[in-house]
Each structure stands twice: as structure tokens, then as C-alpha cells.
């Protein structure tokens, strides 16, 4: 059953005086099944960021619809959208988005605090997550006292502690060194193997090769997609690289 459905999504940006129109997304349609791990790739300016912002309910499409768990996001009232986002989506960003004035524990607790959860409930959820992510000994430290890899694991903990239907990750390995990036990608795979649905936007072929499906966006439209099926990580890496070469060279859409 699809946990996310994107139907004929269009986004047009118009300049202030209406002289120029830029179509950032052109009738984009796809779905993400519960438990899938999907990577979205494309060149800068292809529409990936616009798509992610709409999926995150941070922007609205010009036309088309996005359904999360069968609910049309556009029908969520403006007053309820923040709560809807907090209860259904988990976010992992390139720059971590941790608050320097909060220790790691309080950063992770933040979405639960905003949802009105009590300390006992928050602690009950945190203990197994912190153990799994290997961050138990840094919970009392502040973001500026830990490494980039530790900050990103804390951000992942914050994303999963609400039990979201879907994790949206935006270039999650972009600010990490190769070892920390590898650790994060292994963590994402482990979370996915436990049933967590993940959609990740990335420029990294290595990151995308950990996913079970890769969507390619070009000029605001879905250009191609690859399913991992029985491919090894190395085989998927090569197929992604070949597709990106075709995309950059201007190959046929849906080739």
C-alpha cells in the first residue's frame, strides 16, 4: 500500500510583475510504498528541492496533489499543518538543524515536547533509539561539543522518535566525512530493514546506491527510475552512474 502518492504535481514560479514563468515541476507522478527506501537524484535546478519542499508541506503545488497515508496534504488546514508535519514526517537535513543552546537529549526531545508528551514517555522512546544510534554517551553534550557524524545521528534520532510515517532526508551525507557518511548510510539501511519508509534527496551516487529504488528528475519531470531488485550495491552504483551520464548528456526522457 502506498504511504506517499504524488499525482500530476506542477509548480510554477512567477516573477513579481508576472513577466516570467518558471515551471519547476511538470506533472510529476510517483508513489512510495510503505517500507520503501527511495533516493531522488538530478542536477542542480532539476526540481528536486521544490519537490522535497512540497512533500514536506513547506510549499504548495500549483496543481496536482500529494497524499500521505491517503490524506491529501492540501486539505490539512493551515492551523494544523505544523502538527501534521510533526506527527507524520521526520526530517534529516544536510546541516543537522540542531539548536546550540539545547543539549543533544533536548534536541531529540523537541518534537515530542511540542506535541505535549511527558518526560517519562520521551525517555521511554529515547533509550532504545540512543542505544541503536550509539549516542547514549553524548546525550548531555551540546552540538558544538560533538562530531558531525554524532550530530547527524542525533538528527536521525530526532526524526525517528515521533514514529513518523515517512522520513524525508535532504542531502544527509553532504556535510560528513566519508567514514561518518558510510555510518549514516548503514544506519538508514538498518532503519529501513526494520520497516521505516525513507525518501532521500541526494547528489551522491554512493548514498543513492543504498536505496531500493532511485528516481531521476530532469527539468522538473521524472526522467527515469531504477529498482535495486537483486543488484548488489556495486551493480546499482554503476547503473546509477550510467543513468546520470545519460541524463547530463541529454538522453530521452524515461529512457
Per-range role (PLM):
Residues 102-110:
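Short coil-to-helix segment of the ABC ATPase nucleotide-binding domain corresponding to the Q-loop/switch region
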Residues 56:
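Helix-to-loop junction immediately C-terminal to a conserved catalytic motif
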Residues 41-43:
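The feature captures the beta-strand-to-loop junction immediately N-terminal to the Walker
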